[in-house]
Amino acid sequence: WPQYQCVDELPYQAEIDKQILRLVSPPDSISGVSVTKEFSISERDSSILIHYSVRNVSRQLKRLAPWDVTRVYGGLSFFPVGETDRMNKSDVTGGYEDKGMVWVPCPDGTNERGQKLFSTAYGGWMAHYYRGLLFVKCFPDIRPDEVPPRQGEVEIFVAPKGRYLELENHGKY
């Protein structure tokens, strides 16, 4: 974070090296950074491992934080409640907290504008369940004082009309 085009909008160069799919963004002309995303299968449990790196290709010192966004449709998103923090806020319709978990069901499509939930999460994970499939994102658990400015450790964005949800997590800033 901050969000640069090379993270989420520019095309990536793809290559396969042994058992790793490597995607490399072109240098972003505005930010001066390039992003590499590596995907592999864990030999331990067959989960998909993702490793991101951000390279500063400019001559200026940068202060950045990793950011990951996963877009999903339908279902139910959830994560364990983290520390109390001033950034914890939400205007997401239908989201609620119960038994130490935050639950966000996919909306019915009546929301006219985007909605956003900002929070901390305990244990470094968030998940989404839809039609018999469970997707779990695991990431380093960070303290509230390590979160990028005006962001949450985890965030859920609900697109207008409930077209999709974004499950977002930030790393140490």
Where are the model-predicted features located?
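Extended, loop-rich substrate-binding clefts of extracytoplasmic carbohydrate-active enzymes
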Residues: 1-45, 75, 169-170
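A contiguous, surface-exposed recognition patch within enzymatic or periplasmic domains that forms
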Residues: 46, 57-173
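Hydrophobic beta-strand positions in extracellular immunoglobulin-like domains
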Residues: 53-54
